[in-house]
Amino acid sequence: TNYAGQILMFNNPRDSYGIALKKLGYSQNTTNRDELDQATDELKKQKLLIQAYVMDEIFPKMTAGEAALAPYYAGDAVTMIGDNPDLDFVVPKEGTNRFVDAMVVPKSSPNKDLAEQFINFMLEEDVALANIEYIGYSTPMSNVKARLDEEVQNSFSYPDDEVLSRCETFVNLDEETTAYLQDSWTGVLSYGDSSIGDILFLAVFFLFLIGIVIYFTVKKHRNHTI
């Protein structure tokens, strides 16, 4: 509650439920409805503290100091901390999502050979080094990592085995679970909105009643005066 109104949250169900499930000690890939429902309850409680549900907007908001806490990607965190030294990046003790970016060639690609040549080019040591230094994300190439400056080889870009043991990689969920997550997420986003609407309705209703009372009081007074 110390950060109420200063927290940003991912605006998509997969990431948000992954965070809630990890907090509860469950797998972020669970299909268990009871566990998903518990995560829904956690997200609804969290909504009272949220400033905004966003995605890419996390980058400029955190860099500008418009929020205090937000989930985001380790590679972008390198750039964000460079822009705002007051920021830091931590992996929760419960763990987090371990993601992998990859270059692939569509099966139907009309330029398969050219695409493979481009991938080979990006994997050349000097090119890969320049790419990693520019984008801030980590490299799987040990020869490239060895050439990085020590400050670049920081703990959150290249976490140790203990941290990785607490992380999971997202897997594709079945269609039924995906639909259930989406419906549940819609419920999270709309949670509390109806109560606000009810309050506004009652406020307008009472103002209307007060207006009627005033109208007839004034009218009665005028008639009595006449």
Region locations from a protein language model:
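Extracytoplasmic ligand-binding site segments that recognize negatively charged/polar headgroups
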Residues: 1-66
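Periplasmic-binding protein-like
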Residues: 36-44, 83-107
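A ligand-binding cleft/hinge motif common to bilobed small-molecule-binding domains
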Residues: 63-64, 69-86
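Ligand-binding "clamshell"
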Residues: 79-91, 150-155
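Mature extracytoplasmic/periplasmic domains
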Residues: 106-166
